[in-house]
């Protein structure tokens, strides 16, 4: 048993292809002004047909491991949050473990769509605390370009592809936990408000319902997540929300009240990458030096199933 765990490194990966608003204007009835005014997105990255989601995840995971100074043999748990897995089995976590050469890990996928990474992080934290794992690799990865209808201007303008990863390790004796208690839940009666359904599977949502829920119900829940770590929103150095769209991120962040925090706005450049959005944004903040080791950051995912999960972490 351990008193707690912490994130020791992060990493991210995005495909090379950039799809601009102008590109989309040549595909559907839209414009750069229309997209920016409604969702605040300028560009997004799109993976090619030869770039499966486990490849995106593998690249991000490898970067996180390298940043932590670890080898694949040091990992005994792989948790991947994704809703765009290639197959039901083998799962994405097993595919990532195989790509990286991780010997004999527990490997599991979690499908909680846009709230997936914070659920996965809590799962890894619990496993390390219980002594069931010593080092965990937690990945959020999605290839949303495969599940969007590219003729539907209300959804195709939103999505992007990518992956982000974190290494989770046990705290040293006497060290304060670096991952706070998770606050999670769902609104199952509204689960159809965000969905990936049909054959082939397609992403759809009730945009106004999601907006109202996110901007009216979630601020209080996010503040409660801070309270569980013994902090006030004003104590936060960073707020990393699921990057749904800028018109949700900005009012939600403002209502949380983290007046001293940098607010991740990676959605402007990356679009909505579902489970990848939080670790992708966190890794970029670290890469740019906008957060430093030990800074308290609120990670808060929300979306499909109308699920949510949030926790305060200490930045690596």
Swiss-Prot record:
This is Beta-ketoacyl-[acyl-carrier-protein] synthase III 4. The keyword Lipid metabolism applies. The gene is fabH4. GO terms for cellular component: cytoplasm. Pathway: Lipid metabolism; fatty acid biosynthesis. Residues 243-247 are annotated as: ACP-binding. Homodimer. Pfam families: ACP_syn_III, ACP_syn_III_C. The last Arg residue of the ACP-binding site is essential for the weak association between ACP/AcpP and FabH. GO terms for molecular function: 3-oxoacyl-[acyl-carrier-protein] synthase activity; beta-ketoacyl-acyl-carrier-protein synthase III activity. It is found in: Cytoplasm. InterPro entries: ACP_syn_III_C, ACP_syn_III_N, FabH, Thiolase-like. One of its GO terms (biological process) is fatty acid biosynthetic process. Its EC number is 2.3.1.180. Its main location: cytoplasm. The active site is at 114, 242, 272. It catalyses: malonyl-[ACP] + acetyl-CoA + H(+) = 3-oxobutanoyl-[ACP] + CO2 + CoA. Keywords: Acyltransferase, Cytoplasm, Fatty acid biosynthesis, Fatty acid metabolism, Lipid biosynthesis, Lipid metabolism, Multifunctional enzyme, Transferase. It comes from the Bacteria. The keyword Cytoplasm applies. SUPFAM superfamilies: Thiolase-like. Belongs to the thiolase-like superfamily. FabH family. Catalyzes the condensation reaction of fatty acid synthesis by the addition to an acyl acceptor of two carbons from malonyl-ACP. Catalyzes the first condensation reaction which initiates fatty acid synthesis and may therefore play a role in governing the total rate of fatty acid production. Possesses both acetoacetyl-ACP synthase and acetyl transacylase activities. Its substrate specificity determines the biosynthesis of branched-chain and/or straight-chain of fatty acids.
């Amino acid at each position: 048993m351990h008193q707690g765990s912490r994130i020791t490194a992060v990493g991210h990966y995005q495909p090379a292809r950039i799809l601009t608003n102008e590109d989309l204007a040549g595909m559907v009835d839209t414009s750069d002004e229309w997209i920016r005014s409604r969702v605040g997105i300028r560009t997004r990255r799109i993976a090619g047909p030869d770039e499966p989601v486990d490849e995106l995840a593998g690249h991000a995971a490898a970067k996180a491991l390298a940043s932590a100074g670890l080898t694949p043999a040091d990992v005994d748990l792989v948790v991947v949050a994704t809703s765009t897995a290639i197959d039901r089995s083998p799962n994405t976590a097993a595919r990532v473990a195989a790509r990286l050469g991780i010997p004999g890990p527990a490997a599991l996928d979690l499908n909680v769509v846009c709230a997936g990474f914070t659920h996965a992080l809590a799962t890894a934290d619990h496993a390390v605390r219980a002594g069931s794992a010593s080092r965990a690799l937690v990945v959020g990865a999605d290839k949303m370009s495969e599940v969007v209808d590219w003729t539907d201007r209300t959804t195709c303008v939103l999505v992007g592809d990518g992956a982000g990863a974190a290494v989770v390790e046990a705290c040293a004796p006497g060290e304060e936990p670096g991952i706070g208690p998770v606050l999670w839940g769902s609104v199952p009666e509204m689960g159809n408000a965000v969905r990936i359904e049909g054959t082939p599977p397609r992403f759809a949502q009730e945009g106004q319902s999601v907006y109202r829920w996110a901007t009216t119900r979630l601020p209080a829940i996010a503040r409660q997540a801070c309270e569980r770590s013994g902090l006030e929103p004003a104590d936060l150095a960073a707020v990393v929300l699921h990057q749904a769209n800028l018109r949700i991120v900005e009012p939600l962040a403002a209502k949380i009240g983290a007046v001293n925090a940098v607010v991740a706005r990676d959605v402007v450049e990356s679009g909505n990458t579902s489970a990848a959005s939080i670790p992708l944004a966190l890794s970029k903040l670290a890469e740019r030096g906008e957060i430093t080791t030990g800074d308290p950051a609120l990670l808060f995912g929300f979306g499909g199933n109308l699920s949510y999960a949030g926790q305060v972490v200490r930045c690596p």
